Amino acid sequence: MKILRKTHPLLKIVNHSFIDLPTPSNISSWWNFGSLLGMCLVIQILTGLFLAMHYTSDTATAFSSVAHICRDVNYGWLIRYLHANGASMFFICLFIHVGRGIYYGSYVLSETWNIGIILLLTTMATAFVGYVLPWGQMSFWGATVITNLLSAIPYIGNTLVEWIWGGFSVDKATLTRFFAFHFILPFIITALVLVHLLFLHETGSNNPSGLNSDSDKIPFHPYYTIKDLLGIFLLLMTLMILALFFPDILGDPDNFTPANPLNTPAHIKPEWYFLFAYAILRSIPNKLGGVLALVLSILILATFPLLNTSKQHGLIFRPITQTIYWIFIANLLVLTWIGGQPVEYPFTTIGQIASITYFTIIVIIMPVSNTIENNIIKL
C-alpha cells in the first residue's frame, strides 16, 4: 500500500517540509522560534481578520469602532488584546530568532538570511501601519512624525510625503490606505515565509556546534513537532497571561485619547519594539542623517555574511566574540530604554554613545575579533 503523504502531490511537499525533513539531532530550544513565529503569524492573521469585520477606517469613527469592538462585540476585547499583545510576542520571537542567527552563524546561509531581513522589514512596516489604525493620539502623531521623515529625502521628499498622506496632512485618506496596507502585508509576509523555508530546506538547518551534521540527522516528526508544541504552548500561555491580566502594559496611555491634530503629546514615541531604531534616529541631529541611520540599523544585518572573516562557524567556541556579542545585546537594551526617554541630557548623550557602539561593534569590532581568534587558532 502506498503511503499517501509520500505520493500525493500536495501532501508530498508538506511531508518533505515538516514530517520527513532530515533535521540535525542536536538543535536546541533556540531553534524553536521559527515555528513560534509561524504560530504568531497565524494568530495575528486570524485575530486581525475578526477585528477587520468590525473596524471602520474613517477618521470620524475609527476610534469609536475600536471601543465598540471592546464593549459590544462578543469577546471583542479578547480578540483586540490578543492582536495587540500578539504583535509584541511576534517581535520578541523575531528578535530572539535574529539574535540566534547571529550567535550561531546562520547568516552564512545568505539567501535564507537576506529573505529574513526582508521579512523583518515587512513585519516592521505592518506593525507601524497597524499602530495608526486605532486613531488615538499616539497613533496619529506617530504616523505624522515617522512619515514626515521621508521629507528628508532630497528633491522628491516633500512630494513623496504628500503622496503617502494622500493630502497635506495625516487624514482620512492616510488612515484608509494604512488599513489597506495593514490587511495585505501579512499575506505578503506569508508568501515570504514560504520562500524563507524553501531556501532553508535547500541547504538544511544550521546547528549549535556549527559543524556539518549530514551524518547525524533525524526526521522532523515526531522529535521536533513535540518540541515545537511545547514552545507553542508556552507562547500561548504567555500571550494569554498578557492579554487577560496586563492587556495595556505595553501600550501607550496617550492612545486612550482620540487623535487631535491641535494637541501634541509631550513625548511622541513608537511601540516598544521600535524604540532601539527610534533612539538611533534621534541620536543624530541632522534629519537626513537620522533617517539613513534608522534604515541602516536594520539593513546592516545584511553585512554579516560579508564581514564574516572567522574560520569557525558560530560563536560557541569563540569566547572573545561571545563577550562582544553580549555587549552588543546589552547595548540594544540600552537603546530600547533611551528610545522611551525624553530628549534631554543625559539621555541624548547616552543615546549617541549607544548608537555609535551599535554600528562600531558590527562593522569594526566583530571582524577584528574574528581575525584575532583566527590567529589564536594558529598558535
Curated annotation (Swiss-Prot):
Pfam families in alphabetical order: Cytochrom_B_C, Cytochrome_B
Subcellular location: Mitochondrion inner membrane
GO CC annotations on file: mitochondrial inner membrane; respiratory chain complex III
Residues the record lists as binding heme b b566: 97, 196
UniProt membrane topology term: Multi-pass membrane protein
GO molecular function list: metal ion binding; ubiquinol-cytochrome-c reductase activity
Chief location category: mitochondrion
Keywords: Electron transport, Heme, Iron, Membrane, Metal-binding, Mitochondrion, Mitochondrion inner membrane, Respiratory chain, Transmembrane, Transmembrane helix, Transport, Ubiquinone
Binding positions (a ubiquinone): 201
Family: Belongs to the cytochrome b family.
Note from the entry: Heme 1 (or BL or b562) is low-potential and absorbs at about 562 nm, and heme 2 (or BH or b566) is high-potential and absorbs at about 566 nm.
Function noted in UniProt: Component of the ubiquinol-cytochrome c reductase complex (complex III or cytochrome b-c1 complex) that is part of the mitochondrial respiratory chain. The b-c1 complex mediates electron transfer from ubiquinol to cytochrome c. Contributes to the generation of a proton gradient across the mitochondrial membrane that is then used for ATP synthesis.
Name the UniProt record assigns to this protein: Cytochrome b
Gene source species: Deltamys kempi
Record gene name: MT-CYB
